Amino acid sequence: MTNRRNFISSLTRVAAGVALLASGLSAHAADTIKVGILHSLSGTMAISETSLKDVALMTIDEINAKGGVLGKKLEPVIVDPASNWPLFAEKARQLIANDHVVAIFGCWTSVSRKSVLPVVKELNGLLYYPVQYEGEELEKNVFYTGAAPNQQAIPAVEYLMSKDGGAAKRFVLLGTDYVYPRTTNKILRAFLHSKGVKDEDIKELYTPFGHADYQTIVADIKKFSAGGKTAVISTINGDSNVPFYKELGNAGLKATDVPVVAFSV
């Protein structure tokens, strides 16, 4: 938690400083520096994104208690895109054009980021994106603060294949059906092939956002694991994580039997 708070604190200072330099006298005339908080507080992603909102607000309070940035207090402007991807774009436009925030801290899923991207490019805004992503994108208006697959997913799989990690020979690539899981799993499949893992030892499964019934999928995982030491790489997002792990428990699948590495809890 401390590292995350310090990280957001440093990003907030950078965003405010850049914005003040860029906007000149109009920024100095304001009593506060506005920053946008664009995280889902309702819908399927709220279980993940609400905590990011809370940490951002806590950090802003800490910065303000120490005098703010360049003598000005940070003023958070909070909106709820409600796990609705087009609404992310609408709320981003509102924050930049109407609320005049100097930067936005927001999004979780890559689909929400890609929805916001055209808006921040058009209005020359700044988006600080807080979590891992699939790579294959680089925009000057976005700070990608999370890990790409070569920094997170591949090292995790390498560990699972090692003796210390359990020497997994078979892999279930399980994710929510959108760009980040599919791209990450494409990269992982190629990596596994390079390590001699055959297609018949890789099982790739996807569910929609908000999916709640994992009985069949967990039964498939249990059956698949009978063919050799198996690990699950989960890119399930949002509140679907809850029924997935509950079903693992119901099926009697323990981490010692089938370990699960998750990137989007």
Annotate the PLM regions.
Residues 47-54, 67-136, 145, 207-214:
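Beta-alpha junction/loop-to-helix N-cap segments that form part of ligand/metal-binding clefts
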Residues 30, 54-76, 166, 194-199:
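Signal peptide-proximal N-terminal region
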Residues 4-14:
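N-terminal export leaders
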Residues 16-17, 27-28:
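Cleavable N-terminal signal peptides
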